[in-house]
A protein has these predicted regions:
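Conserved, structured core segments of small domains
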Residues: 1-115
């Protein structure tokens, strides 16, 4: 299962307080990425923080990892989680007779054979 985790600074926490922990924090996430546990990692564009996509069994497993992060142990972050699941076979939503053939190669002009 994929779990999206995103953090926020706890009220009153500043970037100055966060900065000393960043090398160890990044190293921790890097090791999880190399192990295939962290699938994606992004900096937030809307506010300071990160968004991490975990490949884990459930939210509790993702929380185990975030709780072990240096910034979490220091009590500087709050985490939120969104569990994702594979969508049902989308074809079940289509009406009978709808074209479900494989997509054509959109890099060629429609009707031309790819070379």
């Amino acid at each position: 299962m994929r779990v999206i985790a995103y953090d926020r600074f706890r009220p009153g926490v500043t970037m100055q307080q966060i900065t000393p922990y960043l090398p160890e924090e990044v190293s921790n996430v890097w090791r999880l990425w190399k192990a295939g546990i962290v699938r994606e990692n992004y900096a937030r564009a809307d506010e300071p923080g990160v968004v991490i996509v975990f490949e884990v069994e459930d939210v509790a497993a993702a929380r185990t990892y975030t709780d072990d992060f240096p910034l979490s142990k220091a009590g500087l972050l709050e985490w939120s989680f969104i569990a994702l699941q594979v969508p049902l076979p989308i074809e079940t939503l289509f009406r009978e007779g709808l074209d479900l053939n494989p997509p054509f190669d959109r890099t060629t002009k429609h009707g031309e054979a790819a070379q």
